Amino acid sequence: MSGRSRGRKSSRAKGRGKGRARARVRAAAEDAWHDEKPPQSPRLGEDSAAAQVQAGAAQGGAEPAELREEAACRLPLDCGLALRARAADERGLAAPDPDLERARSLAERLTSDTSFVGTVGALAKLRRGSRIGNRRVPGRKAPDTRSATGRGPQATVSGKPKMASAGLCAAAPVGEEKKMTEKHAGAGSPATVGSMDTLETVQLKLETMNAQADRAYLRLSRKFGQLRLHHLERRNLLIQSIPGFWGQAFQNHPQLSAFLNTKDKEVLSYLNRLEVEELGLARLGYKIKFYFGRNPYFQNKVLIKEYGCGPSGQVVSRSAPIQWLPGHDLQSLSKENPENNGSFFGWFSNHSSIESDKIVEIINEDLWPNPLQYYLISEEARGEKGKEERPGPAKLSPAPAVRQPN
């Protein structure tokens, strides 16, 4: 409305308008004077204004001065007093009324308490400090809404961060994606999982069967060991009735004979009995016993060589020392005579090469189970030799024919 049209108003209308304005200003001033509580959160109108501010910030343009003044007039407790006071000053009709001056100072205080926090390119939001009485308290700091990709802060409304647009996706942590990938890769297909379960079941059954077989083997070994013991005792009694049986079996064995020299064969002729005892039901060791009769070489009646497992699980051997008679120590004599390859009886005191001990292997696995076959070799050899030396029947040549005289 122009100034000319305003001048044409009647004095009654002017007075009525001034009275209404003064009443409104007086009521607003009294309400603002007695209200000591901090302003409440903006209403629906404030949300729309903030949304307009955010839209302007997104476009990157400067905010018009008219929108800024309108936003300032939309604050609570203002009720348009600042705009009306400015209009009255422009018209030159504002009188030095104490109520109007009080309202103007209140509007200036509200305007000074309102601060604008800008973002890149435009004003983002209104930041308002809290008031307690006449003292101003610093406002609450808006939370930082920077994303992981380094974008600028998002505009907020009423101190709450605005959600990002639907086109922008939050970056998922790389560690979580890697863990999920490894989890799915290690799970395997259902067929593989089923095969593994079946394989474990079969393996458990095999282990159970092996344990049962071991127990059954120990029971059978104990049972048949007692039966064998009876027959072994009977065999030993029969062998003792045959002089020189074991000495002849040692000499006739194709492998053991390589460890014997001439003196060893003489000593073994006094061997009356040989025993191989198994240590434990699982054959954890052996004890070999040589029973000798009275002889001119040593005083021992029994020579023992024992094999077993030590505390660390390693195979160890033990033997009783041979008590040689003076001048008949075959070990010392074999060292003095370089032609001899060593004495068989040096095996009793040798505990270094247990794993490569061929003598104990031959005795346990070959000679002891069936010594008769090696004793009979000499009988067969003597029989064949006797057949070769025995002369055959002489063939008679026919007598020459005698011619009769005529």
Curated annotation (Swiss-Prot):
Example GO BP: positive regulation of phosphatidylinositol 3-kinase/protein kinase B signal transduction
Q: Where is the composition biased (Basic residues)?
A: 1-25
- Known function: Involved in modulation of cell growth and cellular response to gamma radiation probably via regulation of the Akt signaling pathway. Involved in regulation of p53/TP53. Suppresses p53/TP53 protein levels and promotes its ubiquitination; the function is dependent on USP7 and independent on MDM2. Proposed to displace p53/TP53 from interaction with USP7.
Spell out the family assignment given in the record's similarity comment. Answer: Belongs to the nucleosome assembly protein (NAP) family.
Renumbered to this chain, the Basic and acidic residues biased-composition regions fall at 27-38, 382-392
Q: Quaternary structure?
A: Interacts with USP7.
Q: Name one GO cellular component term.
A: nucleus
Annotated region Disordered: where?
A: 1-67, 132-164, 382-406
Annotated signal sequence is none
- What is the protein name for this chain? Testis-specific Y-encoded-like protein 5
Q: Which domain of life is it from?
A: Eukaryota
Compositionally skewed regions (Low complexity) per UniProt: 49-62
Name the keywords, alphabetized: Growth regulation
* Taxonomic source organism: Mus musculus
InterPro entries in the record: NAP-like_sf (IPR037231), NAP_family (IPR002164)
- Gene that encodes the chain: Tspyl5
